[in-house]
């Protein structure tokens, strides 16, 4: 039978069994090595309320805490929520992650700091 991927869609080489994790979206059990992982760093406070909180704060240079979360997706949820996309046979061999695009406001702020 033909094989679509050299790794069979997983990262389990020479391991018999890998513990499952639950998909963040649908709670399906997925082997940890097969799950699509995404590490998200967000502000605890939403962007609209940041200015209000900084103005009301007693301390001048108080840095708002961030929320760190590692999301695990099953393959179907990752495709549906566009975390990953299907690629051509040649493009599947490219292992480098795609370039990260940032919002224009962040790019402008970075230029002002330099």
Swiss-Prot record:
Tell me how this protein assembles: Component of the 40S small ribosomal subunit.
- Similarity comment text for this entry: Belongs to the eukaryotic ribosomal protein eS26 family.
Main location per the UniProt record: cytoplasm
Q: Which domain of life is it from?
A: Eukaryota
Q: Which residues cross the membrane?
A: none
What is its subcellular localisation? Answer: Cytoplasm, Cytosol; Cytoplasm; Rough endoplasmic reticulum
One term under GO cellular component: cytoplasmic side of rough endoplasmic reticulum membrane
Q: Which UniProt keywords apply?
A: Cytoplasm, Endoplasmic reticulum, Ribonucleoprotein, Ribosomal protein
Q: Name one GO biological process term.
A: cytoplasmic translation
Query: Gene3D superfamilies in the record, alphabetically?
Result: Ribosomal protein S26e
Give the source species.
Drosophila melanogaster (Fruit fly)
Annotated GO MF terms: mRNA binding; structural constituent of ribosome
InterPro entries the UniProt entry points to:
Ribosomal_eS26, Ribosomal_eS26_CS, Ribosomal_eS26_sf
Q: Where is the signal peptide?
A: none
Q: Quick one: where's region Disordered?
A: 87-114
What name appears for this protein in its UniProt entry? Small ribosomal subunit protein eS26
